[in-house]
Amino acid sequence: MSSSTLEGQETASHHSKNSPSRHGDDGGLQTAGDEYVYIADHYGMVRRMIFIMTVCSSMFTNQLGLCNSLSTLEEIGESFGVTDPGKLSWTISGYGLTLGTFILIGGRLGDEFGNKAIFVIGMGWLALTSMMAGVSVYAGYPVYILARVLQGLGPALTVPNALAIMGKCFSEHPRNMGFAWFAASAPVGAMAGLLFGPLFTMAWWPWIYWSQALGVAFVFALSIVAIPNMPAESEQKQRRTILEILERIDLLGGACGVTALVLFNFAWNQSLVATWKEPYVYVCLILSFLFLAAFFYVELRVARHPILPVAVLTSDIAFVFGCTAAGWSTFGIWLFYVIRICLNIGGQTPIQMAAWLSPILVTGIGTALIVGKIITKVPASSIMLFAMLCYFITSLLMALRPVHSIYWTYFFFATIIATFAMDSSLPAATIIFANAVPRQYQGMGSSVIMTIVVYSISLGLGFAGTIELQINNGGHTKADLLHGYRGTLWFSVGLTAFGTVLALIFLLKDLRRRKLARTQVEEEKGHSSEA
């Protein structure tokens, strides 16, 4: 196998029909009669680096798209004549809405039609919608928000399939480090968005998205040749009827789930614009619960290939869902409202905010790589508690921070600690999920957790925005604005306190389970020695 060329149509060889699960959890098993060859294990250094960079670009572009508008909301809104904070927040929450809602479906489409194909389609879609977001300057704010919402579909297709590609192409040890680099690309993408967003705005804000479109178009072309076909893809292309395809991708369950998530999120975020006095807002909320009930019924009673294994969800998964949602929703609140405080009250500039947040670049990469090394040696429940404590400390520091305090006190330490929280909670949650479900469902762990992560960020902003509007007295003065911002940060403190308690309970439960397991092993050894 040549390691010096990038032949996209190169396919891994294998001796059976048993390929790894979606994220490679079972891919490391080899027997004499059933051997799976990991194609990327045989790559040379240059080819391997290009492959990893291409796959990790999905997380990079995901975070880039989320953060490139964070500190430029006011400038973008001003060009459209929009100053309402509720309408401006749709720039972020709209992107997160579609991303969080469609990740599971993106993973299922990759299972059915090929991970590489869906990855490439996702990159192409992201490039086109990024161009649309820039061109919307000539069309109006609704078109801009529509473009942002459609942008979220791109990472929803690329992120889960990037994880699948990594899992199928690498054996266990290089796979773990590949996942670590995947996580490390998140702070790099976030930092790029925070830095280049304001820089391009100094020229003209549409260049934020036009430059993104050009970069993603390059990755689109590179992914065609840099990513090999998965060995199972030829098998997935066998002829199936339309009904069989729809059944395998769980179209009915997916439609009910997506509708429920979209309506629930829309109700909370649109309430910032129209308030709860508008009938259509709370009608959407009621309908979301009805569709959610329909989703659970379909997954439990109807679907032969459920998109989410509702029947096997346990208390362990409930704990990890609660911790993940609490932590990452506060991350969205913290990032959005701390930037608003600094820009609108503290007088800092967007470029200055990029400099203040720059430590996430170093600590993010370092934490991700360290966690990649220790994740198999330290109980995931302990790592989750550590992450939730970091979330809590970060939220508390930012809620207590005086507006005009120097950078090296509250802000610097909160930024460092927040990075520890993010890069340790995600792998811990994925492992806990994988350990809590039957083996055939372990491969979807990353997709499920990413769904919780991204959807929580978007929904958390909706909750926080409701609190802000209720207590800021209209936001006519800086004091009123600050009061509303502070309220959202204290809300994040409460969320992280709740998540920390959940993580502590789960840790105690896990320690008790481990103790019982050790006792049982010792008793079995004693019985066997007596025999």
UniProtKB/Swiss-Prot annotation:
Membrane-spanning ranges: 86-106, 117-137, 145-165, 179-199, 207-227, 249-269, 280-300, 319-339, 351-371, 380-400, 402-422, 447-467, 488-508
Biased composition (Polar residues): 1-11
Induction section of the entry: Expression is under the control of the terrein cluster-specific transcription factor terR.
Membrane-topology descriptor: Multi-pass membrane protein
GO MF terms, alphabetically ordered: transmembrane transporter activity
Cellular localisation: Cell membrane
PROSITE patterns, sorted: MFS
Region of interest (Disordered), residue spans: 1-27
InterPro entries recorded: MFS (IPR011701), MFS_dom (IPR020846), MFS_trans_sf (IPR036259)
Keywords from the UniProt entry: Cell membrane, Membrane, Transmembrane, Transmembrane helix, Transport
GO CC terms of this entry: plasma membrane
Record function comment: Efflux pump that might be required for efficient secretion of terrein or other secondary metabolies produced by the terrein genne cluster.
Recorded family membership: Belongs to the major facilitator superfamily.
Matches recorded under PANTHER family: LOW AFFINITY AMMONIUM TRANSPORTER, MAJOR FACILITATOR SUPERFAMILY MULTIDRUG TRANSPORTER MFSC
Protein name: Efflux pump terG
Gene: terG
